């Protein structure tokens, strides 16, 4: 098992370009962020977006990045040091209990794309709390239908392993736990935002083989353990073997493609 420092480096090298950058690009293509004031980036990872925003501000504001992983924060701080970026700082902290006073930031950006659905409301409520009145809140997330191709073959693998009836209810929960776009917008309004709007993109992740998919850092570090929670521990190796077999059969010598429904939900406090 990877230690926390190795996981942080894997996050920076693999998960940021394969996953995070897609959501950050969606923000950059959909809206213009202010070039002055205070901006907070919650769950900032290894700091790329916060650093990019700070560089655009040319000394007219401050960007604060916060992340629960001290190892990722250390990588972000090292990047800022190399860039001699004095207008960005990074802190370790928990998104559901942000270490800031209310009404501190003109813009609050938060990454919920790797959170479970039941964790998003606490994150969003905290983002709204620390935003200034009339401040903008921007939430990155995935919506229902993400990884739909995987769940289809997962069902086949569970059936082949003789477990489909035992875990069907849990699998159905996994398939449906992500918010729909309308549910996400309604959540933003319940948390205190107005003028809520959303921007979406349909992304594809491509893997040459089942092994490439199941051993990709994005999958192993961020999703696979949750997917396998519904399977008894003693049966997981069998289910993984069935998954490899089903994926390689279904892809028919073509890449295994999975869809990510990326969304940015934004509103004004």
Give the predicted meaning of each segment.
Residues 5-18:
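Class I SAM-dependent methyltransferase Rossmann-like catalytic core
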Residues 18-37, 52:
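Conserved alpha-helix/loop element of class I SAM-dependent methyltransferases that forms part
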Residues 36, 59-60, 131-136:
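Short glycine-dipeptide loop
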Residues 96-108:
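A short acidic, Gly/Pro-enriched loop at the edge of an enzyme's catalytic core
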Residues 195-253:
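C-terminal helical/coil "lid" or tail adjacent to the Rossmann-like core of SAM-dependent
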